[in-house]
């Protein structure tokens, strides 16, 4: 496989995941958590974070989150499944979503 196109890198990351756990791993393990495209690879995610946020990536771990079964009145429905990526940054690197930088 050749180089990843810049257009693909801009589409890979959908949104940061802000939760108690993501805040905890950001402080303790220097990781940031993103919601990504379901077909994104670890290499694409790492390259996208490095190019978009101008940081050095040490590693990427991904997991598929299954959609929960939810009820709306009598009807049972299912939320969409999605993919989550934990991106470990090299020491000294930081992405701060709270300040918008």
Curated annotation (Swiss-Prot):
Keywords linked to the UniProt accession: Ribonucleoprotein, Ribosomal protein, RNA-binding, rRNA-binding
Pfam families: Ribosomal_L23 (PF00276)
PANTHER family (alphabetical): 60S RIBOSOMAL PROTEIN L23A
Protein role: One of the early assembly proteins it binds 23S rRNA. One of the proteins that surrounds the polypeptide exit tunnel on the outside of the ribosome. Forms the main docking site for trigger factor binding to the ribosome.
Quaternary organization: Part of the 50S ribosomal subunit. Contacts protein L29, and trigger factor when it is bound to the ribosome.
Family, per entry: Belongs to the universal ribosomal protein uL23 family.
Protein name (database record): Large ribosomal subunit protein uL23
Lineage: Bacteria, Pseudomonadati, Pseudomonadota, Betaproteobacteria, Nitrosomonadales
Gene, per the UniProt record: rplW
């Amino acid at each position: 496989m050749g180089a990843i196109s810049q257009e693909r890198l801009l589409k890979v990351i959908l949104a940061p995941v802000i939760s108690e756990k993501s805040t905890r791993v950001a402080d303790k393990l220097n990781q940031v958590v993103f919601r990504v495209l379901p077909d994104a690879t670890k290499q694409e995610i790492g390259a996208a974070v490095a190019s978009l946020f101008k940081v050095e990536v040490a590693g990427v771990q991904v997991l598929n989150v299954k959609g929960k079964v939810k009820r709306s009145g009598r009807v049972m429905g299912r939320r969409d499944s999605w993919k989550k990526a934990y991106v470990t940054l090299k020491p000294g690197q930081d992405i701060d979503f709270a300040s918008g930088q």
